[in-house]
Amino acid sequence: MLIYIMKRLLLLPFLLLIFSVIAFILIQAPPGDFLTSYIAELAASGSSMERAQIDALRALYGLDQPMYLQYFKWMGRILTGDLGVSLDWQRPISELIGERMGLTLALGMGTFVFTWLIAIPIGIFSATRKYSFFDYFFTVFNYFGVATPTFMTALVLMWIAFKYYGVSITGLFSAEYIDAPWSWDRVVDLLQHLWLPVVILGLDGTARLARVMRANLLDELKKPYMEMARAKGLSEWRLVMKYPVRLALNPLVSTIGWYLPLIFSGSVIVATVMNLPTIGPMLLRALISQDMFLAGTIILFYMMLAVVGTLISDILLAWLDPRIRLDEE
């Protein structure tokens, strides 16, 4: 097991290096740069800048340098712990991300726990009661969950809450707690607002994971070892939970790698629609304004989450299924 983990850890630096190059290329791919977008905004408002000012700002931000040189300087700062300064916000990137990281973690972990706590029991219940009323009900629910965009669900619930109850369900705090210092009352207010975004963001993942769990468990229930275990006199519920469920979890565990970045992004569109103070809307603003240092840092952070998530899923898979450890060794 230790050798298996060490092999995965040795790959991390190379993967992060490759992902950093990809992230930088992605933020450099659109035509123009931050100053181009800023000048366009000034022109739309009837203002303008002198050519000398533009050249001075381009030199100040390093936008006049070759792309490879910009990349090495960017990575050099990151390796020393300096994430740089946002061109749009004119503030250190570490401060901007730090301000939103706590709420992003709360929303992301809440969504993750909600998704797994609901999806796995639904999948087990549907598979063990195949073609029952509950199986059909959850199948329809899963289809709706997969087919309905999460931002559409958010818009519908926001409309219902405002039209019939006269309340706004946007944001994570009431108006009086938005800028207030942390206190017990502010935590309670956060929890009162947090559950709805968690449910909205978790519906899609719950539906997908429940379908995967049901399909995998049905395959396991048909295998010969189940008949042998029944012949030994094991109770059906204990039999299902001890062997097939554990094996059916393997594909779900393997999804952690790509699911983790999605959780921490908080679904950019949903977070923007609901005005959630998470990292997702900040990434959207950085991409629109072509704030390459802020956008690149956030994208690299998501890629690191994908790498870490894949490592976690590999370790969990090796723990759940000893055959994986034996094959690697």
Predicted region positions:
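Charged, compositionally biased N-terminal leader segments and the immediate start
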Residues: M1-A29, K242
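Alpha-helical transmembrane segments of integral membrane proteins
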Residues: L2-I3, M101-F134, T150, Y177-E329
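Residue-level recognition of pore/gate-forming positions within transmembrane alpha-helices
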Residues: L12, S20, W116, Y143, ...
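Membrane-embedded alpha-helical segments of multi-pass transporters/permeases
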Residues: L16, S20, F24-G32, S37, ...
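Hydrophobic alpha-helical transmembrane segments of membrane transport/permease proteins
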Residues: L16-L69, Y165-R186
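Membrane-water interface segments at the C-terminal ends of transmembrane alpha-helices
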Residues: I22-A29, G76, F141-L172, I200-T206
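Short hydrophobic, aromatic-rich alpha-helical segments embedded in or entering the lipid bilayer
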Residues: S48-T80, N275-A286
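An internal, D/E-rich "acidic patch" concept
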Residues: G62-I120
